[in-house]
Amino acid sequence: MAKLTTNTFFNTKNIVAFSFFLVFLIVISVIVTIFFLGVSVDDVKTIITAINYQNWGWIFVVILGFLVSVLWNVIINWWVSRRFCFYASWWEWLLFGFVVQFFQIVTPLSLGQDPFRLYWFIKKGMKKQTAVLIVTSTGAFWNLSQALITWPSFFVLSKNYQLLANNHNSFVSYWLSLTGMIFDVVVAILFIVIAFNKKMHVLIYSLVNQFRKWLKRPYLTKEQIYQRFIEKAEFNKLYGIEMRRWGLTIFKLLANMVVAIVSYFSLFGVFMITKTVNTTNNVIDQYSLIDLFNITNIAVTASNFIPVASGEGATQFVMTSFLNAFKPTDQFLHDQIKDGVFLWRLLSVYLPAIFTGICFVVWIVQVIWEFKKTVNVPLKTVNTVSLETKKDK
C-alpha cells in the first residue's frame, strides 16, 4: 500500500517554468507574425477570405501532419510498453498522445515531452528504470530520421548556393540549416552513447544524486551508484536487448521518417488553399511539390538548435528567405508567401497548441480528481524484463 499525499509534478517551480514557456511562445509568435511577417489583424481576415474554397480539402492535408504525429506518440509508446505488461485504457493513451504533442510544441527544443512521458509511466505504476528504458529507447529515432531525410534536401538546395549567397537573409538561412542538421546528428549520437556508456550513467546519476541530496531526498552512496551502473549494469543490458529487437528498431526509424515527411508536405497544401484562380503567378506555379518539401524540411531543421518553442521565428525566417531567393518575386508573390507561411504556422502550430493545451488541462483535472478520490491505493508494479527468459519475438 502506498499513500498518495503530494503531487510532485505540480510544484511551484514546475508551474512557474511551464507558464513562462507558454507566455514566451505566445509573445514570440505575436512578435514574429506582426513585425517579421508583417501580418496584421486585417491581413488575417484577408487571408481567410482569400482562401480558395474549392481547395478546402487541403486543410486536412496540413492538419494531417499534426494528427499523424499524435497517433505516432500513442502507437510507439503503447507498442514498447506492452512488453512490460503495462496497461492503460484507450482514452488515456489518446490523451497521453495529445499532451506529449503539447509539450513538443510549447517547450524549447521539445524538452518537455520526455520528462512528461517519464512522469506519466511512473505515475501509472511503472518502475523508474523501465520508464527510463522506454523513453531513451525511442528518443533518438526522431533526430536520426530527420538527419536521414534532411541531408538529401540540403544537398539539392546547395546546388543553388550562388543564388543564396547573393541575398543576406538566404545566406544566413543556409548556414542556420547546416547547423541545425549537424545538431540533429550530434543529438542522435549522444542518445546512443549515453545509453550504452556505463561511465556516463555514473556521471549523470551522480549529478542527480547531488540534486536529491540538496533537496534532502533519499540518495545513494558512491559505492551504491558504482555497483548499480558498473558492476550490475542492468540498464545497459536491458537497453541492448531493446535496441537489438531489429524489427521494432527499423519500424521506429521508418515510422519517424514517415511522420516527418507527411508534416513537411503540409506547406504545399497551404499554398493550394491560398492560390488565386486564373493566374499563373501563384507560389505553387513557381515551386514544385518537391521544392516546397525541401524548403519546409530544411526550414524546420534549421531551428532545431534554437532554444525557442517550436523554433518560433527561425522557421519563418528561413522559409520566407528561401522562397524569396530562388524565384523572382513581385509584390503579389511576396504577399502570398508571407500569408502562406503564417497560415501554415496557424494550422500546424498555433491551433494545435490551443487544442492540445485544452487536453493538458483535462489531464490535470483528471490527475487532481484521482488524488482527491483516493488517499490510500495499491500501486501496481511493472517489472522489468528478465534477461534470462525474455527473448525478442
UniProtKB/Swiss-Prot annotation:
Topology with respect to the bilayer: Multi-pass membrane protein
Gene Ontology CC terms, in alphabetical order: plasma membrane
Segment forming the signal sequence: none
Keyword Transmembrane: yes
Subcellular location: Cell membrane
Transmembrane parts of this sequence: 15-35, 56-76, 86-106, 131-151, 176-196, 253-273, 289-309, 349-369
Top-level taxon of the source organism: Bacteria
Key words of the record: Cell membrane, Membrane, Transmembrane, Transmembrane helix
Protein name, entry field: Uncharacterized protein MG306
